[in-house]
Amino acid sequence: HHDHHAAVGGGGGGGGGA
């Protein structure tokens, strides 16, 4: 997942946040 730009709290849905 490695979504640094996405919020850590929503890491599971980081793709949507980004």
From Swiss-Prot:
Keyword Nucleotide-binding: no
GO cellular component, one term: extracellular region
Keyword Transport: no
Keywords: Secreted
Main location: secreted
Species: Bothrops cotiara (Cotiara)
Family per record: Belongs to the pHpG family.
Subcellular location: Secreted
Name used for this protein in its record: Poly-His-poly-Gly peptide 1
Additional free-text comment from the UniProt record: Poly-His-poly-Gly peptide are encoded by two gene families: snake venom metalloprotease inhibitors and bradykinin-potentiating-C-type natriuretic peptides (BPP-CNP).
Function: May serve as a metalloproteinase inhibitor during glandular storage. Their inhibition may be instantly disengaged, by dilution or physiochemical change, when venom is injected into tissue of the victim.
